């Protein structure tokens, strides 16, 4: 786990536990997406990196500006969450907090997103069959994210969490080439 993820972990856990206890997982996911998006903007990110948040008056002003940008999109609890993160100089990890929160949410809801790369668009029947097979293998509800990647030559590449199924023609050709060179 990267340093930023390590720092983000307790914040993500606190947000998740609070959201779960208050039956507001979807609302918190949206609010954290908002804060992560704001924190990822180049101008804001630069300020986050430069400000000393430990008791500085300009840090309070920056935090208020940050919350003003999110005006109407964060409830009181999420605003307090952002303030606590700012007081501890941790706004830089908001994107990591979001990612960890979403992992916890997906784990709790027993869902997983599977990214499918193929040369041509999948038919509805192929999508249905793929979802059924993945749900059986992963024991989770699967949401497909189908993308076109013409560099694959043929076949498909499936990524779901830590599972990677490489059924591409490109991969088969590379394995054949490796075995011929051995």
From Swiss-Prot:
GO cellular component, one term: plasma membrane
Membrane topology of this protein: Peripheral membrane protein
Domain of life: Bacteria
Alphabetic keyword roster: ATP synthesis, Cell inner membrane, Cell membrane, CF(1), Hydrogen ion transport, Ion transport, Membrane, Transport
Gene3D superfamilies: N-terminal domain of the delta subunit of the F1F0-ATP synthase
Function: F(1)F(0) ATP synthase produces ATP from ADP in the presence of a proton or sodium gradient. F-type ATPases consist of two structural domains, F(1) containing the extramembraneous catalytic core and F(0) containing the membrane proton channel, linked together by a central stalk and a peripheral stalk. During catalysis, ATP synthesis in the catalytic domain of F(1) is coupled via a rotary mechanism of the central stalk subunits to proton translocation. This protein is part of the stalk that links CF(0) to CF(1). It either transmits conformational changes from CF(0) to CF(1) or is implicated in proton conduction.
Subunit structure: F-type ATPases have 2 components, F(1) - the catalytic core - and F(0) - the membrane proton channel. F(1) has five subunits: alpha(3), beta(3), gamma(1), delta(1), epsilon(1). F(0) has three main subunits: a(1), b(2) and c(10-14). The alpha and beta chains form an alternating ring which encloses part of the gamma chain. F(1) is attached to F(0) by a central stalk formed by the gamma and epsilon chains, while a peripheral stalk is formed by the delta and b chains.
Name listed for the protein in its UniProt record: ATP synthase subunit delta 2
Originating organism: Photobacterium profundum (strain SS9)
Name of the gene encoding the protein in the UniProt record: atpH2
């Amino acid at each position: 786990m990267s340093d930023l993820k390590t720092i983000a972990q307790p914040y993500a856990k606190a947000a998740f536990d609070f959201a779960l206890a208050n039956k507001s997982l979807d609302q918190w996911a949206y609010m954290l997406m908002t804060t992560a998006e704001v924190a990822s903007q180049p101008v804001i990110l630069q300020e986050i990196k430069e400000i000393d948040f430990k008791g500085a008056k300009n840090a309070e002003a920056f935090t208020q500006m940050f919350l003003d940008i999110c005006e109407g999109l964060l409830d009181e609890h999420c605003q307090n969450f952002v303030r606590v993160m700012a007081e501890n100089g941790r706004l830089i990890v908001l994107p990591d907090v979001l990612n960890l929160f979403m992992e916890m949410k997906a784990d709790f809801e027993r869902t997983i997103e599977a990214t499918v790369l193929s040369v041509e668009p999948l038919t509805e029947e192929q999508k249905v069959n793929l979802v059924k097979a993945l749900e059986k293998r992963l024991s989770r509800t699967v949401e497909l994210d189908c993308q076109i990647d013409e560099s694959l030559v043929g076949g498909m590449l499936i990524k779901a969490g830590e599972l990677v199924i490489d059924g591409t023609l490109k991969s088969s050709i590379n394995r054949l080439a490796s075995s011929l060179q051995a």
